Design a protein with these regions (language model features):
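N-terminal cationic and glycine-rich segments that engage phosphates or anionic surfaces
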Residues: 1-141, 182, 211, 252
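Positively charged, low-complexity, intrinsically disordered RNA-binding extensions
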Residues: 143-252
Length: 252
């Protein structure tokens, strides 16, 4: 499995730990604030905000926290002003990495991201050095064990009718792909079946993958973990391909 879906699975497995540290709430608050600032505070008119509100509710974030974050984004309440930034990089084994951040200090964030990359066998790349290796797609992961008894045909028909352009069976999960502009409708179609996706967002999907094994694979996992633990990092995309055995070893 390639890096985008593999890392989504890893993050899901470590979700309970993240929640204890408040990391999920911190990230969601930033995303809510920025989404409201960019597209307004009405979720009916702001698909990006509507999706993040759904994520926040799924994470059991209190309703007042959600409202407060949105009000900060619209300027109704004072708060920290976050800026979006994206860094392109190479990881161990030459794997491409794209790091999305929300930060109140771009210079500080860039320096810290550079340090983490160099510490774990990677390096920052020039703009557009690796971005061309990815396509922007709506990407939804459904855990078969949590599909509420719905079979593959039922889910596939629902998402294709809603605008999905690809549906894949990945063993434990089903993966649904769509154009970014169709993502909201496809995600709603999944939820209308009573299914809560493991992961659902507009993502950068690699066109090709780089297979990593052994020490290099473990080093890549350590880099991903270090980046994910950074307070400003919101999302990481990569084109690595690592076996389930290597993944389990990294989680042990």
């Amino acid at each position: 499995m390639s890096g985008h879906s593999k890392w989504a699975s890893i993050k899901h497995k470590k979700g309970a730990l993240d929640a204890k540290r408040g990391r999920i709430f911190t990230r969601l608050i930033k995303e809510l604030t920025v989404a409201a600032r960019a597209g307004g505070g009405d979720p009916d008119m702001n698909p990006r905000l509507r999706t993040i509100i759904g994520d926040a509710k799924a994470a059991n974030m209190p309703a007042e926290n959600i409202k407060r974050a949105i009000r900060r984004g619209t300027g109704e309440e004072p708060g920290v002003s976050y800026e979006e930034a994206q860094y392109e990089a190479y990881g161990p084994g030459g794997a491409a990495v794209i790091i999305d951040v929300l930060t109140d200090n771009k210079n500080r964030a860039a320096g810290e991201i550079r340090h983490l990359l160099e510490k774990h066998g990677g390096n920052l790349a020039a703009p557009n050095a690796v971005a061309w290796m990815f396509n922007k797609k709506g990407y939804i992961v459904v855990d078969k064990a949590k599909a509420g008894g719905k079979d593959e045909e039922t889910l596939m028909n629902a998402v294709l009718e809603a605008g999905a352009d690809d549906f894949q069976d990945d063993g434990e999960n089903w993966e649904v792909y769509s154009a970014p502009e169709s993502f909201a409708a496809v995600n709603e179609a999944v939820k209308a079946l009573g299914i809560e996706p493991t992961s659902a967002k507009v993502s950068l999907i690699p066109q090709n993958t780089v297979k990593l094994e052994g020490k290099v694979a473990q080093q890549m996992m350590k880099l991903m973990e270090a980046l994910d633990d950074h307070d400003d990092v919101q999302n990481i995309s990569s084109n690595f391909d690592i076996s389930e055995k290597e993944i389990e070893a990294s989680l042990a």
